Amino acid sequence: MKSKLKLHGFNNLTKTLSFNIYDICYAETPEDQQAYVRYIDEEYDAQRLTQILTDVVDIIGANVLNIARQDYDPQGASVTILISEQPVEPTESQIEESPGPLPETILAHLDKSHITVHTYPEIHPVDGLATFRVDIDVSTCGVISPLKALNYLIHQFDSDIVTVDYRVRGFTRDVEGRKHFIDHEINSIQKYLSADTRAAYQMTDVNVYQENMFHTKMLLKDFDLDNYLFGDATLNLSVEQRKQVEKRLRHEMLEIFYARNMPH
């Protein structure tokens, strides 16, 4: 383990992980489209999201100060958790550049500042394409990196497309008064993903190292059409219809991945 940086007072660095997760599907009829929205609304209601974020608090090592949660009408949910740091010495595994735990290996450790999640179900008015977006922000103040929560969160949602941003702001001083604008090594957000996750996604990085800003976009490689069909009406699609639906879905996913409208 590298020698620890001796600080003058508290570590004042703020580390923020922001990411958007998209789940795409095709629902042919208006009835199936509304059923999809209801399904998502029930599957990821405020109570379920609270449990997921509480697990994140354990992963990054935090204490819960307050939880505010809300289910919205007609759809969507939000949860905000305020968290605080304990005076506990971080372990090497909590600060090194490596993947965080998977859902089945969660261990509670120590803690930080706030976590928020918002959900956005959406349906295309004509094409039958339905999108479920989850926006999550994990902001910590101190030595622990919120990137440790990334691996777990991707496995908690049906993630077809993921956009991740990580930035470090502020500075902290060592005992000699020298400023430090980042306190850990990082070359890519991808280093915090497990091997199976890296293998499953096509990934692109845009990093601004001198500004301590890191960006990774992820697109699921494997495409099985049956995993994207929702509702009874999709059970009897003809071969030609299946080809058309697959074309629409792939086009939708590429537009979201590249964040721009593309010609058909």
Curated annotation (Swiss-Prot):
One of its GO terms (molecular function) is adenosylmethionine decarboxylase activity. Is synthesized initially as an inactive proenzyme. Formation of the active enzyme involves a self-maturation process in which the active site pyruvoyl group is generated from an internal serine residue via an autocatalytic post-translational modification. Two non-identical subunits are generated from the proenzyme in this reaction, and the pyruvate is formed at the N-terminus of the alpha chain, which is derived from the carboxyl end of the proenzyme. Binds 1 pyruvoyl group covalently per subunit. The keyword Glycosyltransferase does not apply. Pathway: Amine and polyamine biosynthesis; S-adenosylmethioninamine biosynthesis; S-adenosylmethioninamine from S-adenosyl-L-methionine: step 1/1. Its EC number is 4.1.1.50. The keyword Lyase applies. GO terms for cellular component: cytosol. InterPro entries: AdoMetDC_fam_prok, S-AdoMet_deCO2ase_bac, S-AdoMet_deCO2ase_core. Its cofactor is pyruvate. The record marks 112-113 as: Cleavage (non-hydrolytic). Keywords: Autocatalytic cleavage, Decarboxylase, Lyase, Polyamine biosynthesis, Pyruvate, S-adenosyl-L-methionine, Schiff base, Spermidine biosynthesis, Zymogen. The active site is at 113 (schiff-base intermediate with substrate), 118 (proton acceptor), 141 (proton donor). The modification Pyruvic acid (Ser) is found at residue 113. It catalyses: S-adenosyl-L-methionine + H(+) = S-adenosyl 3-(methylsulfanyl)propylamine + CO2. One of its GO terms (biological process) is spermidine biosynthetic process. Belongs to the prokaryotic AdoMetDC family. Type 2 subfamily. NCBIfam families: SAM_DCase_Eco (TIGR03331). Heterooctamer of four alpha and four beta chains arranged as a tetramer of alpha/beta heterodimers. Catalyzes the decarboxylation of S-adenosylmethionine to S-adenosylmethioninamine (dcAdoMet), the propylamine donor required for the synthesis of the polyamines spermine and spermidine from the diamine putrescine. This is S-adenosylmethionine decarboxylase proenzyme. The lineage of its organism: Bacteria, Pseudomonadati, Pseudomonadota, Gammaproteobacteria, Pseudomonadales. The gene is speD.
